[in-house]
């Protein structure tokens, strides 16, 4: 389980923490910023190179915004050279 990294999108932080507690893992460090023009910026704050990355997101209203947060987070993990997402 050394190569497993679990990250939370903003609406799923509590749920992700429960998963990490159950698996005895630390939740991954990630920064989600939302600009005034509604653009999102995600930065993964730890190394995920060659790791299996799990991104937890809930799909509660507003659904479109939640899906975009998830897709942008997936893109950030891909750009950080995650092995599997």
Where are these regions (language model features)?
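PRPP-associated nucleotide enzymes
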Residues: 1-85
């Amino acid at each position: 389980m050394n190569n497993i990294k679990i990250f939370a999108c903003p609406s799923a932080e509590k749920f992700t923490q429960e998963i990490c507690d159950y698996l005895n893992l630390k939740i991954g460090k990630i920064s989600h910023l939302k600009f005034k023009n509604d653009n999102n910026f995600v930065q993964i704050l730890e190394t995920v190179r060659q790791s299996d990355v799990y991104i937890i997101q809930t799909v509660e209203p507003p659904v479109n915004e939640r899906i975009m947060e998830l897709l942008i987070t997936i893109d950030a993990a891909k750009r950080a050279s995650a092995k599997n997402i």
